[in-house]
């Protein structure tokens, strides 16, 4: 049986959470994967080199600040310039596949923003890369209906884990149904193998967070945060971190607590799927 490995992104370490919480969470994610019997591989750029698995010293340096954020459009340039960077979902998906890691755990994927139009590179990366991604759905700040439509158009296999509806990141439920459901890690592994045999792209396994927040309440906070961003002229790559920061303020830190929980739950599920997959291959 081949070694079950789980890729983990490093943007949560460099841009997702404040120091030292970011380092604490990144280390906890790796430990959660190990506890389930798989090997964690946090992916990042360190001084112009791709690292698949980080030392404690490298994690500390990335968490302390000053690192870039690497997506597909600037990945080559950052490497050529010798920079250090946290990897987004899109970059992590690409690099994990290059290094033969078929399972990746994250919090939430990027998608389609409502206004002005802005689409994450995560969607195209998922469509063209045969990898299984465990997440709690698209980030709560996105247009879920439009994101689900784009995933369908791009041919990404969206599968609910013990749910018939799309999780909305902080919320375990939303009004939008998913096209397929599985109830065990083994079922998820079999879907991935079928997708790979068919030459399809990625499988997005959406895992509802336990003890999440009500969908309607989060939607109100997102609307208010969006108005703040519009007033302050925030857009582009600055928009997502701005909105997530405002959601934390509006919820008195509750979204941060749920974010940590869902990251850990997704890491554990990804490890279980990786173990099932290793037993099938």
UniProtKB/Swiss-Prot annotation:
Sorted UniProt keywords: Glycosidase, Hydrolase, Lyase, Manganese, Metal-binding
Domain of life of the native organism: Bacteria
Any one GO MF annotation of this record: metal ion binding
Catalyzed chemical reaction(s): D-ribose 5-phosphate + uracil = psi-UMP + H2O
Active site positions, chain numbering: 9 (proton donor), 139 (nucleophile)
A cellular component annotation (GO) from this entry: cytoplasm
Residues bound to Mn(2+): 118
InterPro entries given in the database record: Indigdn_synthA-like, PsuG
E.C. code: 4.2.1.70
A Gene Ontology BP annotation from the UniProt entry: nucleobase catabolic process
Quaternary organization: Homotrimer.
Function: Catalyzes the reversible cleavage of pseudouridine 5'-phosphate (PsiMP) to ribose 5-phosphate and uracil. Functions biologically in the cleavage direction, as part of a pseudouridine degradation pathway.
Name recorded for this polypeptide: Pseudouridine-5'-phosphate glycosidase
Biological source species: Thermus thermophilus (strain ATCC BAA-163 / DSM 7039 / HB27)
Source organism phylogeny: Bacteria, Thermotogati, Deinococcota, Deinococci, Thermales
Gene name as annotated: psuG
């Amino acid at each position: 049986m081949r070694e079950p490995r789980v890729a983990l992104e490093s943007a949560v370490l460099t841009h997702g959470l404040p120091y030292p919480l970011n380092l604490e969470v990144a280390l906890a994610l790796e430990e959660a994967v190990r506890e389930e019997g798989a090997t964690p591989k946090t992916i990042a750029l360190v001084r112009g080199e791709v690292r698949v698995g980080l030392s404690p010293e490298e994690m500390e340096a990335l968490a302390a600040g000053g690192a870039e954020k690497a997506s597909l459009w600037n990945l080559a340039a950052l490497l050529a310039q010798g920079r250090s960077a946290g990897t987004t979902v899109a970059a992590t998906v690409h690099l994990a596949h290059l290094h033969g890691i078929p399972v990746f755990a994250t919090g939430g994927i990027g998608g389609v923003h409502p206004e002005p139009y802005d689409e994450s590179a995560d969607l195209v990366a998922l469509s063209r890369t045969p990898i299984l991604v465990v997440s709690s759905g698209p980030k709560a700040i996105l247009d879920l209906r439009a994101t689900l439509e784009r995933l369908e158009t791009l041919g990404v296999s969206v599968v609910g884990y013990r749910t018939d509806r799309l999780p909305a990141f902080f919320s375990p439920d939303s009004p939008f149904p998913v096209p397929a459901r599985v109830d065990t890690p083994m079922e998820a592994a079999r879907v991935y193998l079928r997708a790979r045999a068919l030459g399809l792209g990625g499988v997005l396994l959406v895992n509802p967070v336990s003890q999440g927040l009500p969908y309607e309440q989060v939607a109100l906070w997102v609307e208010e945060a969006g108005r703040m961003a519009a007033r302050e002229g925030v857009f582009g790559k600055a928009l997502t971190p701005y909105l997530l920061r405002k959601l934390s303020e509006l919820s008195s830190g509750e979204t941060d607590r749920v974010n940590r929980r869902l990251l850990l739950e997704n890491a554990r599920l990804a490890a279980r799927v990786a173990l099932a997959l290793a037993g099938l291959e």
